[in-house]
Amino acid sequence: MSVAVSRAYELGVKEVSIPSAGNAAGAMSAYAALAGIKSYVFMPKDVPSPFISECKALGAEVTLIDGLITDCGKAASEGVKKYGRFDISTLKEPYRIEGKKTMGYELAEQFDWNLPDVIIYPTGGGTGLIGMWKAFDEMEQLGWIDSQRPRMVTVQSYGCAPIVKAFEDNTEFAELWNDAHTIADGLRVPAAVGDFLMLRSLRESNGIAIAGSDEKMLDSANLIGRTQGIFASPEGGATLAAFLKLRETNWIKETETVVLFNTGSGHKYSHLWESD
């Protein structure tokens, strides 16, 4: 997001807009505030309140939509067309991917230019997965790594798993997921613009798409907290739940190196722990 807003600033953009279930909106609002750019955020009205409060505190104008992220996208698009705002929606501009791909570069550097065997990533819009795959291709062209790639694993919720279904059905594009629901707002994306790019990275890497229950997500987030000292989001918990399932079936071998990505803080989902 830093790259996207920085480039918008270089281009003289005065207003930026995004539909988001939380984390992307917070990041855009923060960088836009620093750059002196007005930010407009469109969120589902049922997202946890910390996501909304963060954006407002950072100066964003927040519009709550009665619907899903796809409905927010339509509302944001109307503002883009009417007022000429710079659209930072997923894959509507090229710069967010350029920022996301630095995860791949950082990972390679930390592993001394030998990539892990498996990467498990929680997937909504999919920019993280797509960005890392782009980074690996670039690093091979630069001669920094060889042609060996990690097996990429995308994780979704049983309540919203369009990429999993498309992967299992062996289709190039994912169908719209009806009645999308999950406690992990970052995974509640019933239709992703970059679906074909995600599916391509999974298949080219001999990876897999896997879904799990909200209950397992939360249990695994708790396990991460109690063993690693990290207050992970449900999305992060989903990656551990997927890992445990794939180890149980021996899809992941005991000797393999595996990286799990936690993409958010449990603090923004504190309501999920209030009953404990």
Residue ranges and their predicted role:
Residues 16-24, 91-96, 121-125, 212-213, ...:
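Active-site nucleophile and cofactor-binding loops and adjacent substrate-binding regions
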Residues 107, 112-134, 141-142:
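Glycine-rich ThDP/TPP pyrophosphate-binding loop and its adjacent helix/strand module
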Residues 4, 8-29, 35-43, 115-125, ...:
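A short, small-residue-rich loop immediately preceding and capping a beta-strand
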Residues 70-85, 138-232, 275-276:
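Active-site/ligand-binding loops adjacent to catalytic centers
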Residues 175-181, 237-276:
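Phosphate-binding loop/pocket of nucleotide- and phosphate-handling active sites
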Residues 39-115, 167-172, 180-199, 210:
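Small/polar-residue-rich loop-to-helix segments that shape phosphate-bearing ligand pockets
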Residues 69, 92-94, 123-127, 134-136, ...:
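Glycine-rich beta-alpha junction loops
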